[in-house]
Amino acid sequence: NKFNLELLDIWYMACIDSSLPEIYLQTSEKLVPQMLNLDIDEIGVNFSKGCYPGQEVVARLHYLGSAKRRLFTFKSEAELNIGDSLYCASSKTAKVRGNRYKGSGIILNKVKFNSLFHCLATLDVDLIENEITLNNEHGPTLKIIHNE
């Protein structure tokens, strides 16, 4: 059986266009449902029933606070990898630790499509209007496509 990689890329692109994230080893245990927009209209999380690991944290964030990170779609000419960090050197959250900035987001899914890399990534919501770079403050720039 041969897989048609072109069709697989079309599938991955459709998932990215639809903001349907997949969790991989590189990104597991780094996210809560709100970062993936699964709390919006309760499409992925029901806050009125169920019991699951982490439910208390997820519910507390829903009822008492607001998500500081959300899921966004980006594109770039540079190669992207799942688990890569997003940076915004001008942000208040970009705290210097030695010579390194704290990441402001993480890449969850990616695909190369029509000679560009497209990805779903979490990002601090107050940074969507700023220049976002990959892996460090001097890395390649990512452009936000939409933020639904």
Short names for language-model regions:
Residues 24-49, 57-61:
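A short, contiguous structural element within a folded domain that forms the immediate neighborhood
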